[in-house]
């Protein structure tokens, strides 16, 4: 994982 990028957002946001 790149040092500038955080983990993906929660699935609830997305949906």
From Swiss-Prot:
Keywords: Secreted. Its main location: secreted. One of its GO terms (cellular component) is extracellular region. It is found in: Secreted. Immunodominant for delayed-type hypersensitivity reactions in guinea pigs. This is Proline-rich protein.
């Amino acid at each position: 994982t790149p040092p500038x990028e955080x983990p993906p957002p929660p699935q609830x946001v997305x949906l």
